[in-house]
């Protein structure tokens, strides 16, 4: 005899069908909740780079913030928009400090040694993105540098969210870029249509 969810009896009129439907619904509920629980924090929050909460009022942030440490966004695209904005801020600060905009300098600021294994983070990003550690990168606002920087963002997502590189949502990265730099929308679309330029994935 099938074990039915509480409150449903197979002896009732149509009880067997009700039992089967209720069992399927319960199994689906358990499956969905397991998937939700197994998601990493960055994925649940639509915050792929795990940007911490601060006084910044991020565009696309959820009205109700239930995570005490990290920002929660409405969509993954808004999470990536914030990531692009942070990188642009880094570029501008590095310029004022006379520092080159490189993967090493970016990660040393993003994941300082006081809280992270910075060297391991850098090595992982370099391996995943195939970018040189001291290679000077173009500013995020310059669409010509999108190829390398989007690989950097994807690699950082892998580390922050525990994803395989092939599972990173590249479309959301592009959507986030367009939200961050709306004047570059058409240029990015043209860039993405260029097969020679898009081979980096």
Question: Can you name each region flagged by the protein language model?
Answer:
Residues 3-201:
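Cell-wall polysaccharide-cleaving catalytic domain and substrate-binding groove, primarily
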């Amino acid at each position: 005899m099938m074990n039915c969810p509480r409150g449903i009896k197979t002896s009732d009129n149509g009880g067997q069908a009700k039992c089967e439907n209720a069992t399927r619904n319960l199994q689906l509920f358990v499956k969905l909740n397991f998937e939700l629980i197994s998601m990493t924090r960055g994925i649940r929050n639509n915050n792929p780079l795990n940007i911490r909460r601060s006084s910044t009022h991020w565009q696309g942030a959820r009205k109700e913030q239930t995570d005490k440490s990290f920002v929660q966004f409405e969509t993954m695209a808004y999470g990536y928009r914030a990531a692009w904005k942070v990188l642009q801020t880094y570029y501008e600060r590095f310029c004022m400090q006379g520092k080159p905009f490189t993967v090493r300098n970016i990660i040393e600021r993003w994941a300082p040694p006081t809280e992270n294994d910075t060297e391991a983070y850098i090595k992982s990003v370099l391996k995943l993105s195939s970018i040189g550690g001291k290679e000077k990168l173009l500013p995020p606002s310059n669409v010509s540098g999108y190829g390398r920087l989007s690989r950097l963002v994807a690699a950082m997502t892998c580390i922050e969210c525990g994803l395989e590189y092939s599972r990173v949502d590249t479309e959301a990265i592009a959507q986030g870029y367009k939200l961050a730099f709306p004047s570059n929308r058409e240029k990015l679309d043209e860039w993405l249509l260029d097969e020679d330029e898009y081979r980096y994935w």
